[in-house]
């Protein structure tokens, strides 16, 4: 075991085999004398499985939270099938979407999972039938409150409500896929700067704090223990390295390279420890809404129409439009944030278009399987990438396979519901904090001292948090006389991320400002143009390959019809031709809490996975 508190090595995805290699400490005067050489070779399968299991735990936390809040909002009653099968169908659709996303979508190691962008419209849709079921006076959060009084009766069966929500998920998937096929990111990105993306990330980190506190409230001791262990493993013990597996150096000699095990497993170790402790003290109890009256089957094949087909109504169409707009805004933010945390160039429009298209396909699959939640890029999983400072396509593929396996076995999926709620709250709290800090750190890319920018940032964040709270605490909701329009307006005006992105976009493009002031220097149409402009040409060319399609599919691009050419990279990417004259040491490490330069040798390791 070795410890290097002054220069902790940063881990990133390198090589076509997705190996994780520690970066050398900075040596500005002689870059060739780094204490560590770039390492090649495939990532050990044991470590890959552990890293994938961490992502599954974070995804399971999101799924349990989403299903629990939604089922608690329904009228008293019950499902005609096991809730574990509903959870398994969500795992299956998320796993398939993750595999497609990392293989031929954005190509980033992004895990697909449901988010608040799907939950909020679903709650609005069900609350229209249950006006007194989930509204608690004086409370602005999505309360875990089920109306059990005599006034809550005969308001519809659970199956019918979930059918309508599944219909909204199908509509959102179709709209999101259409936006990707039409190349919407390519039209929007040139008008988006750091002042559009950064407020959205800040609001994304803050928007779930009430729900996190609600789950932590069930047992603050266990929640604080999880948070404390995650902080200690990822930060205080992050520089402790162990010789755990053999790697091959750039030279011909073979050696054992130490890895920061505590930081890499800073989610798995705390969750496993507290989960075991809570089981010993008898606190690991499955919530009533997720408990199955009968044992779930070990093997089960999800297929469309098993529990009735999705119900397409005007109200479901309105909720689906809100889901599509909010989920697309959130996903584009995840693409840019994940690329930045992995020190890649900003994702090009063709990668974002493919990502949105395949996310839409995943949501359509989820809705047809009866899941009440669609699939989108997950902010908590991106926060986990920033927490452990590593990302790998190989790990993301394993996550997808594990989720498909859980979807085929409801009994195994039900096992994850035994994770104590305070553990779920603690994990989501730490990962959301990383997203929040990444949003704050993005402001430096623009002139934050400008009065124009100060107003845009403050107004966007404050209004995105104020409007949802006002609508949730309003004693009487607005009524237009047409229920679908009420659902659409209420869903959009209670989506914090959508409001932050929309207000930032409108203010950024209507208030006069210079390109440099807006953070759009050198004419590069991306949210992180200042970062890309400082990246040397050769490392940028190598890193940009991660967004390109796999070789067999790349050969099919000439056969794609002209309207769909936005899904394929250009023969000569303009971003690859613009070089920079700065040295590798000028590219600062953008991960939260670190300030080490990123050497050129590490950036040359990025390659697309064939």
From Swiss-Prot:
It is a multi-pass membrane protein. Residues 1-49, 107-164, 209-211, 288-316, 377-394, 447-452, 508-610 are cytoplasmic. The keyword Transmembrane helix applies. It comes from the Eukaryota. InterPro entries: NCS2. Acts as a sodium-dependent hypoxanthine transporter. May show xanthine-hypoxanthine exchange activity. Its main location: membrane. Belongs to the nucleobase:cation symporter-2 (NCS2) (TC 2.A.40) family. Residues 601-610 have a biased composition (Basic and acidic residues). Residues 1-32, 571-610 are annotated as: Disordered. GO terms for biological process: hypoxanthine transport. GO terms for molecular function: transmembrane transporter activity. Keywords: Membrane, Transmembrane, Transmembrane helix. This is Solute carrier family 23 member 3. Residues 71-85, 186-187, 233-266, 338-355, 415-423, 473-486 are extracellular. The gene is SLC23A3. Residues 1-16 have a biased composition (Polar residues). The keyword Cell membrane does not apply. Residues 573-588 have a biased composition (Acidic residues). Pfam families: Xan_ur_permease. It is found in: Membrane. One of its GO terms (cellular component) is membrane. It catalyses: hypoxanthine(out) + Na(+)(out) = hypoxanthine(in) + Na(+)(in).
């Amino acid at each position: 075991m070795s410890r290097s508190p002054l220069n902790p090595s940063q881990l990133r995805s390198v090589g076509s085999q997705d190996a994780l290699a520690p970066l050398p400490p900075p040596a500005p005067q002689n870059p060739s004398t780094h204490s560590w050489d770039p390492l090649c070779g495939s990532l050990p399968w044991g470590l890959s499985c552990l890293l994938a299991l961490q992502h599954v735990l974070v995804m399971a936390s999101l799924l349990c939270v989403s299903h629990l809040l939604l089922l608690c909002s329904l009228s008293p009653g019950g499902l005609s099938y096991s809730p574990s099968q509903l959870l398994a169908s969500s795992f299956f659709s998320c796993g398939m979407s993750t595999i497609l996303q990392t293989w031929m979508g954005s190509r980033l190691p992004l895990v697909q999972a449901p988010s608040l962008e799907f939950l909020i419209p679903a709650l609005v849709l069900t609350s229209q039938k249950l006006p007194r079921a989930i509204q608690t006076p004086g409370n602005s959060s999505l309360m875990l409150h089920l109306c059990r009084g005599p006034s809550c009766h005969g308001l519809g069966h659970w199956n019918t409500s979930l059918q309508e929500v599944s219909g909204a998920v199908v509509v959102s998937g179709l709209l999101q896929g259409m936006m990707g096929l039409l190349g919407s990111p390519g039209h929007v990105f040139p008008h988006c700067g750091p002042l559009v993306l950064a407020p959205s990330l800040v609001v994304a980190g803050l928007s779930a704090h009430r729900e996190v506190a609600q789950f932590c409230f069930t047992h603050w001791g266990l929640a604080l223990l999880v948070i404390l262990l995650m902080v200690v493993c990822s930060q205080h013990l992050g520089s402790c390295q162990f010789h755990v597996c053999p790697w091959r150096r750039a030279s011909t000699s073979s050696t054992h390279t130490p890895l920061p095990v505590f930081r890499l497993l800073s989610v798995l170790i705390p969750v496993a420890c507290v989960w075991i402790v809570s089981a010993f003290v008898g606190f690991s109890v499955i919530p009533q809404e997720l408990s199955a009256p009968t044992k779930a089957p070990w093997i089960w094949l999800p297929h469309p129409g098993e529990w009735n087909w999705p119900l397409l109504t005007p109200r479901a169409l309105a909720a689906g439009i809100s889901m599509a707009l909010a989920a697309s805004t959130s996903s584009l933010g995840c693409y840019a944030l994940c690329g930045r945390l992995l020190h890649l160039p900003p994702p090009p429009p063709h990668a974002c278009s493919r990502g949105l298209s395949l996310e839409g396909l995943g949501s359509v699959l989820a809705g047809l399987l009866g899941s009440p939640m669609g699939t989108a890029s997950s902010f908590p999983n991106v926060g986990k990438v920033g927490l452990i400072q590593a990302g790998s396509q190989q790990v993301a593929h394993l996550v997808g396979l594990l989720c498909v396996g859980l979807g085929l076995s409801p009994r195994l999926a039900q096992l994850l519901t035994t994770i104590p709620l305070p553990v779920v709250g603690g994990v989501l709290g730490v990962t959301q904090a990383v997203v929040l800090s990444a949003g704050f750190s993005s402001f430096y890319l623009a002139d934050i001292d400008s009065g124009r920018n100060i107003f845009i940032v403050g107004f966007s964040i404050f209004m995105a948090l104020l409007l949802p709270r006002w609508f949730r605490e309003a004693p009487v909701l607005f009524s237009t006389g047409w229920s679908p329009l009420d659902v659409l307006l209420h869903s959009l005006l209670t989506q914090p991320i959508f409001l932050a992105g929309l207000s930032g976009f409108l203010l950024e493009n209507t208030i006069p400002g210079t390109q440099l002031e807006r953070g759009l220097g050198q004419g590069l149409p991306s949210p992180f143009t200042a970062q890309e402009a400082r990246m040397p040409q050769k490392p940028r060319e190598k890193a940009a390959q991660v967004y390109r399609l796999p070789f067999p599919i790349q050969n099919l691009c000439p056969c794609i019809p002209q309207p769909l050419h936005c899904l394929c990279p250009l023969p000569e990417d303009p971003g690859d031709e613009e070089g920079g004259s700065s040295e590798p040491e000028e590219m600062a490490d953008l991960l939260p809490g670190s300030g080490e330069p990123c050497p050129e040798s590490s950036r040359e390791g990025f390659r697309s996975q064939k």
